[in-house]
Structures are given as structure tokens and as C-alpha cells.
């Protein structure tokens, strides 16, 4: 005991070096490389689950103990020491650590993020790149554990880390629409077919002598769907939507078939005439007759029924034709006369009221 007290360095010069460990007592060679000693102790401190544990012997190095100062100023750290077999094995184990162990927890410590050491101890991995075990302090970031703090993770890893709602779902819209389109191709006509049918329908309708309003009324009589003259006009002009054109095409096609099949027999013609109002023949008035009517209009813009009858007999025209001509002439005069000016029919005072039906023509 006295000898040990008188020679405090006898422990360092002994043939064996003994230090405390969590698993028990381990002996080390006095000529063992301090770098290898630190790496072997670190490897023993890593359990099977991949979580490195803080070794109390390594922690004591950062407390400024005698071993810390001795190793920091040792000439072995200043000279170039080639890595041994244990160094290569340690680097290979750290480099080939499985990704699921590294991503096990966001608080898992990376070998590059261990506590600082006073000496720059480093090892070389299997790829030949230096791997600092103790000299890079810091904390790990989730998703960047295997790639350091500056290099982003691969694209596959970033995709897996996204929330399921944020991930792009597989595009099934095109497949669904393509399936529906293939299913409806047999029933839905193309735009070229609709254009060709509209052209043929207009030609056949004019040849048969029916107006667009007649067709709309006929569809209501045949199928219960009354269409206006505007709808038939927009169909012929291809101004309806594609969906409405497809709905109206079979109805008009049936009407054409019915009209073509009933052209020869009088009974069928009467049936079609009853379905819709047949177009009346346009009346053409000669220039001489029109001059007589103009002269009479300047004298009396609103003739009575007896005057219309006598005028129709003298001109050999129908009474309805004369009445409609006067009605249309008054409307024309009203359009041509600026507002506020006195119109010709206001000069003459007549007690006969104009028939309201003349304005419909």
C-alpha cells in the first residue's frame, strides 16, 4: 500500500490495464491503440436493437479526467495511423446498418451525432470515406438520419413519409371515362353524324312543306314532347348542346320516317296536317295591285270590314289577304315614323277597330 502511494504511476506501468465497464471488468493491453480502445468500447456499448448507449467510461473523457488530457496530447493522435481490421469491421457495421433501425425513432442517436470528444478520433468505412464517430455533436432529424444533416433523403423515402391523404392517388379518371365512352359509343352519335343529320332534316322538312313550328307541334302530338320553333331552329343550326342534340335526333328521325311514309296517301297527309299547322303558300301581289293598296292606305290606313271586302272584290283578291296587307302596312309605317310625329292613320278618324289577329301575321 505504501509502495503504491509512493509511486502513483505504478498503475500505468503495470502489465495490464483494468477499467470499469457496465458488463464487468475487461483487461486491455498497455500498448493498445487508444483509438481502437475507444471504438471497441463504443461497439460493446451498442446493444442488439441498434440504440447506442452512453458509456460512462467514454463520458468520463469529456469531464477533463487524466485519461482525456493524456490521450489528447498523445503523439499517437498526431501521427498517421492506418486502420486495422477492427476499424474496418466497425465501419462496415455502422455503414450497413438497416434503414428500419435508423428510422426507428426520431430521437435515435446517429453515430455522426454522438457526444464530442477532445481528440478528433475518426475511422474509415468500407467505402473508403472517413466516418467521424465522436467528433460531430448534434441531434438527428426525422427522415434524414441515414443521409446526414445536409443531404435530403431519397424520393422513395419522402413519398413514404407523406400522409396518406397527401399522397397522389392513382389516376382512375381516365380509365373510368374511357370505359364509359366505349360503353356509350354504340348509342351516342358523333358530331359529324349530327351535323349531317341536321342538314338532311332541314332539306326534307322544307321539301315536305312544314315549318319548324309544325315539327315542334307534331313531336308533341306523336311523342308527348312539345318543342318550340326556336328549339327546332337551333337544332338545324347546330346551336344546341351535344347532349340535347343527341336527345332530339331520334325524335326528329322518327318524325321524318312518318312524314316520308305518309306522303302518297291523302289520309296520311291529313294526319300529318292535323299534327302540325301546315305552311301556307306565300301570296305574291303584283305591282299594279300593290299601288292601288298604297293609294287606299294613304286615304284610310284603317279601313272597315265592308271597305276591305269591296276592295278585295275589285282587285280579285281574298278578303283575308287584303286585311293582312293593311295590317302589315300599318306596322311598317309605325317602324318608319320617328316617335312624336303624327302618323297617317291619326289624321283620319275611324270608328272601326282593327282586328287583333292581323298582328300575328
Curated annotation (Swiss-Prot):
Residue segments, region Disordered: 99-131, 144-192, 334-361
Protein name as catalogued: POU domain, class 3, transcription factor 4
Tissue distribution of the protein: Brain specific.
Compositional bias (Polar residues): 119-131
Residues in POU-specific domain copies: 186-260
Residues modified as Phosphoserine: 265
GO biological process: cochlea morphogenesis; forebrain neuron differentiation; inner ear development; negative regulation of mesenchymal cell apoptotic process; regulation of transcription by RNA polymerase II; sensory perception of sound; transcription by RNA polymerase II
SUPFAM superfamilies: Homeodomain-like (SSF46689), lambda repressor-like DNA-binding domains (SSF47413)
Compositionally biased region (Basic and acidic residues): 165-183, 343-361
Subunit structure: Interacts with HNRNPU.
Cell compartment(s), UniProt: Nucleus
Function noted in UniProt: Probable transcription factor which exert its primary action widely during early neural development and in a very limited set of neurons in the mature brain.
Lineage: Eukaryota, Metazoa, Chordata, Craniata, Vertebrata
GO cellular component: nucleus
GO molecular function: DNA-binding transcription factor activity; DNA-binding transcription factor activity, RNA polymerase II-specific; double-stranded DNA binding; minor groove of adenine-thymine-rich DNA binding; RNA polymerase II cis-regulatory region sequence-specific DNA binding; RNA polymerase II transcription regulatory region sequence-specific DNA binding; sequence-specific DNA binding; sequence-specific double-stranded DNA binding
Record's keyword annotation contains Transferase: no
Alphabetized InterPro entries for the sequence: HD, Homeobox_CS, Homeodomain-like_sf, Lambda_DNA-bd_dom_sf, POU, POU_dom, POU_domain_TF, TF_POU_3
Keywords: DNA-binding, Homeobox, Nucleus, Phosphoprotein, Transcription, Transcription regulation
N-terminal signal peptide: none
Family membership noted in the UniProt record: Belongs to the POU transcription factor family. Class-3 subfamily.
DNA-binding region per UniProt: 278-337
Amino acid at each position: 500500500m505504501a509502495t503504491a502511494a509512493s509511486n502513483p504511476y505504478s498503475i500505468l506501468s503495470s502489465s495490464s490495464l483494468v477499467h470499469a465497464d457496465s458488463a464487468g471488468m475487461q483487461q486491455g493491453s498497455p500498448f493498445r491503440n487508444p483509438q481502437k480502445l475507444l471504438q471497441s468500447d463504443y461497439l460493446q456499448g451498442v446493444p442488439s436493437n441498434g440504440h447506442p448507449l452512453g458509456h460512462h467510461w467514454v463520458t468520463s473523457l469529456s469531464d477533463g479526467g487524466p485519461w482525456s488530457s493524456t490521450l489528447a496530447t498523445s503523439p499517437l493522435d498526431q501521427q498517421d495511423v492506418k486502420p486495422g481490421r477492427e476499424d474496418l469491421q466497425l465501419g462496415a457495421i455502422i455503414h450497413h446498418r438497416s434503414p428500419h433501425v435508423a428510422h426507428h425513432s426520431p430521437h435515435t442517436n446517429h453515430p455522426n451525432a454522438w457526444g464530442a470528444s477532445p481528440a478528433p478520433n475518426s475511422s474509415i468505412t468500407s467505402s473508403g470515406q472517413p466516418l467521424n464517430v465522436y467528433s460531430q455533436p448534434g441531434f438527428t432529424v426525422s427522415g434524414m438520419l441515414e443521409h446526414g444533416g445536409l443531404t435530403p433523403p431519397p424520393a422513395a423515402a419522402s413519398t413514404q413519409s407523406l400522409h396518406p391523404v397527401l399522397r397522389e392517388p392513382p389516376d382512375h379518371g381516365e380509365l373510368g371515362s374511357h370505359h364509359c365512352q366505349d360503353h356509350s359509343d354504340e348509342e351516342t352519335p358523333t358530331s359529324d353524324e349530327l351535323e349531317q343529320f341536321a342538314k338532311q332534316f332541314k332539306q326534307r322538312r322544307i321539301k315536305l312543306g312544314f315549318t319548324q313550328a309544325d315539327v315542334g307541334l307534331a313531336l308533341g302530338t306523336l311523342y308527348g314532347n312539345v318543342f318550340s320553333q326556336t328549339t327546332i331552329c337551333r337544332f338545324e343550326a347546330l346551336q344546341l348542346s351535344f347532349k340535347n342534340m343527341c336527345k332530339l335526333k331520334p325524335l326528329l328521325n322518327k318524325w321524318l320516317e312518318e312524314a316520308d311514309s305518309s306522303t302518297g296517301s291523302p289520309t296520311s297527309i291529313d294526319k300529318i296536317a292535323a299534327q302540325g299547322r301546315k305552311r301556307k303558300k306565300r301570296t305574291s301581289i303584283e305591282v299594279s295591285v300593290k299601288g292601288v293598296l298604297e293609294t287606299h292606305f294613304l286615304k284610310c290606313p284603317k279601313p272597315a270590314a265592308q271597305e276591305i271586302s269591296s276592295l278585295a272584290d275589285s282587285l280579285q283578291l281574298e278578303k283575308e289577304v287584303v286585311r293582312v296587307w293593311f295590317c302589315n302596312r300599318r306596322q311598317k309605317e309605325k317602324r318608319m315614323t320617328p316617335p312624336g310625329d303624327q302618323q297617317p292613320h291619326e289624321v283620319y278618324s275611324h270608328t272601326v277597330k282593327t282586328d287583333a289577329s292581323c298582328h300575328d301575321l
